[in-house]
C-alpha cells in the first residue's frame, strides 16, 4: 500500500508532535505487546524482567522508537533505508515478521491514548499505512 504525499505529511506532522515523548511511547507499546501477546516474550527471554515499565522494556522501547523516527526520515524509501535493520531481524535475531505488525498495532494504540486530539481518523489511517509499509520493509530480507 503506497503512501500518498498527504499520508507522508500526516506521518511527519504527527512525528513532530510525538517525538519528544517517543521513548515513553516505545516503552508503553512494548510493555503492552509483551503483556497482551505473551508469545512475543520468546525474543526477549534473556532479559531478567519483562514486565511493563522495567529497565529492559524502557531501554528497548527507546531503541524501537529511534528506529521509527529513522523510518519517518526515510519515508520515501523505507525498503532501502531499513535494509540493514531488516537483515538484522531476519538473519541474526530471527524475528517472525508477523511481530512487526503486532508491535505497530501497540504503538498506534499508545499514540491514540496519549494524543487523542492529534490523532483523528484521517491521521490514524495515514499512520496505519506507514506502519504497514514499515513492517513490509522490515520483512524484505525474509524473501
Swiss-Prot record:
Pfam family, one: Globin
Function as written in the Swiss-Prot or TrEMBL entry: Involved in oxygen transport from gills to the various peripheral tissues.
Tissue: Red blood cells.
Subunit and partners: Heterotetramer of two alpha chains and two beta chains.
Example of a GO cellular component annotation carried by this entry: haptoglobin-hemoglobin complex
Stored SUPFAM superfamilies: Globin-like
GO MF term (any one): iron ion binding
Chain positions recorded as heme b binding sites: 89
Key words, A-Z: Acetylation, Heme, Iron, Metal-binding, Oxygen transport, Transport
GO biological process per UniProt: hydrogen peroxide catabolic process
Organism for this UniProt entry: Cyprinus carpio
CDD domains: Hb-alpha-like (cd08927)
Keyword tRNA-binding listed: no
Modified residues (N-acetylserine): 2
Binding site for O2: 60
Family of the protein in this entry: Belongs to the globin family.
Protein's UniProt keywords contain Heme: yes
Record-given protein name: Hemoglobin subunit alpha
